[in-house]
Curated annotation (Swiss-Prot):
Belongs to the anthranilate phosphoribosyltransferase family. It catalyses: N-(5-phospho-beta-D-ribosyl)anthranilate + diphosphate = 5-phospho-alpha-D-ribose 1-diphosphate + anthranilate. The lineage of its organism: Bacteria, Pseudomonadati, Pseudomonadota, Betaproteobacteria, Burkholderiales. The keyword Magnesium applies. Transmembrane segments: none annotated. The gene is trpD. This is Anthranilate phosphoribosyltransferase. It comes from Paracidovorax citrulli (strain AAC00-1).
Length: 345
């Protein structure tokens, strides 16, 4: 079923849904650059104002997946993405990136999909680059990296070439749109398990249901009540969990895992270099709130990856991976492997 751009815009003005097949058609036109920048901007702004439905988000994500450059991972057992929508304004160091190394050292395979900082001081690509990781590998090299080190980093612009058709509109609008919530739904490696942080409480239920429709196996969508798009140490965290096809929604608290509640102020950074130093301090085993929040998020990721039976078990495994030096060693392996692959090795 097709819909004209003008009809779609009128629907958003009237706060009416664009149905699944219509959204597929509309999104393909947008991603192929068939609409003018003015019409694209009007439609994505209209969707934002009326609030995107689960069906609209799911259809848009399907099109982005369809047009992406995929990473073929042979064995997706324990494969997990740790990702956030961004836009929480917290400007913390790269917690999910640090948690990725810890989770990989504790038995998960991590396929992280990220880009440069837009709303934050340091995006995952910025800090990975500052750590010496080669982020511009082709899909087949990333698949080898996951097989060899348990970690693959997918630089989003390399895997979503069609995004170039909407990038100028996004930049000029300068506000959150549908595309901010699509990125975490479109992992090019098809990770069946995911820990996703979101920037608004309403997105917990929306994103976990979109993941359900998109075929995810074990997903946890989280929102820290202090505004963080991570599992938070500073407040309760809302959780939407998809497991065995069923969705449950609940809250978790740092105290549930024997962790002291603490402010996020000590986690803030101004530059990718500061984020790099804080991340390295955690991997080197230094104590403090940065270590605690990484253990918390890595532990939940290990639960999402079905490596740990419970979140508490995951946190214990995360601590052990840091204490043994295995997490730092995993970073060093990734740097060496990506450089070798970039050189053709």
């Amino acid at each position: 079923m097709s819909i004209t751009p003008q009809e779609a815009l009128q629907r958003t003005i009237e706060h009416r849904e664009i149905f699944h097949d219509e959204m597929l058609h509309l999104m393909r036109m947008i991603m192929r650059g068939e609409l003018s920048p003015v019409m694209t901007a009007a439609i994505v702004t209209g969707l934002r104002v009326k609030k995107e439905t689960i069906g609209e988000i799911t259809a848009a994500a399907q099109v982005m997946r369809e047009l992406s450059r995929k990473v073929a991972v042979a064995d997706t057992t324990h494969l997990v993405d740790i990702v956030g929508t961004g836009g929480d304004g917290a400007n913390t160091f790269n917690i999910s990136t640090c948690a990725m190394f810890v989770a990989a050292a504790a038995g998960a395979k991590t396929a992280k999909h990220g880009g440069r900082g837009v709303s934050s001081k340091s995006g995952s690509a910025d800090v990975m680059e500052s750590l010496g990781v080669h982020i511009d590998l082709p899909p087949e090299a990333i698949a080898r990296c996951i097989a060899d080190t348990g970690i693959g980093f997918m630089f989003a612009p390399n895997h979503h070439p069609a995004m170039k058709n909407v990038a100028p509109v996004r930049k000029e609008l300068g506000v959150r749109t549908l595309f901010n919530i699509l990125g975490p739904l479109t992992n090019p490696a098809g990770a069946p398990n995911i820990l996703m942080g979101v920037f608004h409480p309403d997105l917990v239920g929306i994103q976990v249901r979109a993941l359900q429709r998109l075929g995810a196996e074990h997903a946890l969508v989280v929102y820290g009540r202090d505004g963080m798009d991570e599992v938070s140490l500073g407040a309760a965290t809302m959780v939407g969990e998809l497991k065995n096809g069923e969705i449950t929604e609940y809250e978790i608290h740092p105290e549930d895992f024997g962790l002291a509640m603490s402010s996020n102020r000590a986690l803030k950074v101004e530059t990718p270099e500061q984020s790099r130093e804080m991340l390295l301090s955690v991997l080197r085993g230094e104590p403090g709130s940065a270590r605690e929040i990484v253990c918390l998020n890595a532990g939940v990721a290990l639960y999402a990856a079905n490596v740990a039976a419970t979140m508490a078990d995951g946190i214990a495994r995360a601590r052990a991976a840091l204490d043994s030096g295995a997490a730092l060693a995993r970073l060093e392996q990734l740097v060496a492997r990506t450089r070798a692959l970039a050189a053709g090795g």
